[in-house]
Amino acid sequence: MQKLKQQVFDANMDLPRYGLVTFTWGNVSAIDRERGLVVIKPSGVAYETMKVDDMVVVDMDGKVVEGRYRPSSDTATHLALYQRYPSLGGVVHTHSTHATAWAQAGMAIPALGTTHADYFFGDIPCTRALSEEEVQGEYELNTGKVIIETLGEVEPLHTPGIVVYQHGPFAWGKDAHDAVHNAVVMEEVARMAWIARGINPALNPIDDYLMNKHFMRKHGPNAYYGQK
């Protein structure tokens, strides 16, 4: 588990490095599928003082099996996503400014250009509002459930992120590093969409043929972007 703890620590430290978090407003996790264990950031521990050994290991029921701190308060959301989507290896939650602004506005982040299409196949969806009962009950678990409800049958690695209504963004990937990479991209395309819509409020979404080309050349069965 030490290698996975190091990966999760490094991914968490990338959040302030890329300007995605203020204070302790974020968390990254990763899963060991063979052992059924998840490594996640401890709750409320400052990035400036956090160490590798502060990472918390939990089982799939959220029980701490290793670590001296309580795990992130969002642990149940992470676990719900891992349980539903076997392809996920890492999950990240932040309150990055522009992605959170779309969440607070209750709007999907529109696919307006090729930067977006290189990573997200279509709009980045926004969930519905959680009911009072869902918030007063198992809030973090219900946050995971509403993400799953919103994604439906979408392949999660084709839409590697979402904004939770009035809350903020969650992103995921093949591992913790990939999840953070997608969170960084989500924040950038959220900012670009805000600027573009400000310049031209009547702007149309990216054409399907252009979106398909950009996404598939990086992620499709015959992808040719980058080096093998």
UniProtKB/Swiss-Prot annotation:
GO cellular component term, pick one:
cytosol
The protein here is known as: L-ribulose-5-phosphate 4-epimerase UlaF
Q: Which cofactor does it need?
A: Zn(2+)
The entry's substrate-binding residues are G26, N27, S43, G44, S72, S73
- Tell me the route in metabolism or biology where this protein functions: Cofactor degradation; L-ascorbate degradation; D-xylulose 5-phosphate from L-ascorbate: step 4/4
Reaction equation(s) it catalyzes: L-ribulose 5-phosphate = D-xylulose 5-phosphate
State where Zn(2+) binds. D74, H93, H95, H167
> Which GO molecular function, any one, fits this protein according to its record?
aldehyde-lyase activity
What is the top EC class of this enzyme, as a single word? isomerase
Listed under GO biological process in this entry are: L-ascorbic acid catabolic process; pentose catabolic process
Q: Which residues act catalytically here?
A: D118, Y225
The task this protein performs is described as: Catalyzes the isomerization of L-ribulose 5-phosphate to D-xylulose 5-phosphate. Is involved in the anaerobic L-ascorbate utilization.
| Keywords assigned by UniProt, alphabetized | Carbohydrate metabolism, Isomerase, Metal-binding, Zinc
Cofactor note (record): Binds 1 zinc ion per subunit.
